[in-house]
Swiss-Prot record:
One of its GO terms (cellular component) is extracellular region. The keyword Amino-acid biosynthesis does not apply. This is Uncharacterized protein C2orf66. Its main location: secreted. The keyword Cell membrane does not apply. It comes from the Eukaryota.
Amino acid sequence: MIIDSSRIPSFTQLHSTMTRAPLLLLCVALVLLGHVNGATVRNEDKWKPLNNPRNRDLFFRRLQAYFKGRGLDLGTFPNPFPTNENPRPLSFQSELTASASADYEEQKNSFHNYLKG
């Protein structure tokens, strides 16, 4: 009985195939776990707009607590995010909006006239 040695894989071929399979399975498992965990985190985190004063106040209080928990007290620094404690009445804000709108129309018309030559 003659055994053809060309059909028998060598030790290095078997070893490299055996180490690739578990490594490939590990990579696939990590990718799938990352997608599952990433999807749950994305569903839980919903950002609220900071133009609402309550949301803005909550955001900055949580940010300050985060830094304080890591040993950095932001109370010793000047306030880089000033909040408007006494907002103007609505009539002043509408005047500013009307003024800004008039300025925009003026610039738009002057640019249009410039293009006409």
